[in-house]
Amino acid sequence: MPSHARHATFRLLHGLSLMVAMPALLAAAASAAPSPAAQLAAPPQAARPGAPPVKAGSQTFNTVITKLKEGKQIFSNTIIGPDLEVAKKACQGVDFVWIEMQHSTLTWRESQQLIKTVAEAGCIPFVRVPTANESDIQKATDAGALGIIIPMVDSVEEARNAVMFSKYPIGHRDNPNARPWGHRSSGQMQAPSLWGPGYAVNANNNVLVMILIENPKGVGIIDDLLEEVQGIDIVMVASNDFGMHGGDRDGDASYNAREKLVRESVLKHGVVLAGPSSWKDRPGYRLFQGPRDATTTGYEPTPAPPK
């Protein structure tokens, strides 16, 4: 047989042998590769030095959620500047840090560093986004925020969009226990390095959506909003603007009536009720925004270096 014919015959027989063996090879590979569920159950590698990894079999790495389930009140401090030493100190004695972007000049690059610093200090980072659009919410979640704070909510559509932009549309694809709604795209960026390799399939169960009720229009739709929108985790009575937009003050009969309406609706729907830390003794309130920077908490910004 000519040499070129022998080579052709060999290639044909070799190809046939691979076709026969392929099902067995694929089966072996499938049995060797862990399923998504098995990957979640396996102890993950620590994402960063000193970071608590996602525990084996655990789907909750947001400790605020754990504490709420335990019936605890949740406290925070608020930061409005980029000083990372202030951010570290802000974590002392509280459950989460409120990173203020609506009423500050913080850039997204600065906020990303603040989120990382807060997480590495053992605290949960929340971000009040400047606006409730997809771009701002995407940046906050990709940077690793586990609480998305939506200001001045006064429409059902705005609340629904806030939830959609905060959640992945994964449904039952990777995690059958994940809350399924969402329109968030899968950039992830810094978040997995902070919260571990199980982040993507567990994010929907760990990213909390907090809406702020600040004006009479928001008060008027609160019942419909909570009836129609699935995925609102926390509703906060934003006490200052609540009075500013209502033309009254805390303690006035009109103010108290609006606050009661919001409070009763939130509690009726089983949602966490939030307010300023000065309201910690009021019935029904479970989560609180603490003071800003060094106003009353006692932690001080890092002094400027001498020139």
What are these regions (language model features)?
Residues 65-77, 119-128, 201-214, 261-275:
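Short beta-strand/loop segments at the ligand-binding rim of alpha/beta enzyme cores
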Residues 75-79, 97-99, 125-129, 148-150, ...:
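Hydrophobic faces of well-ordered beta-strands that scaffold small-molecule active sites
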Residues 44-76, 191-205, 261:
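N-terminal amphipathic alpha-helix/helix-capping segment at the start of soluble metabolic enzymes
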Residues 147-229, 239:
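Conserved anion-binding
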Residues 13-27:
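Bacterial N-terminal signal peptides
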Residues 57-61, 103-117, 132-137, 154-173, ...:
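Active-site-adjacent beta->alpha loops and helix N-cap segments on the catalytic face
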Residues 87, 132-146, 150, 157-158, ...:
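Catalytic cores of alpha/beta
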Residues 52-125, 132, 164:
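Conserved N-terminal beta1-alpha1 strand-loop-helix module at the mouth
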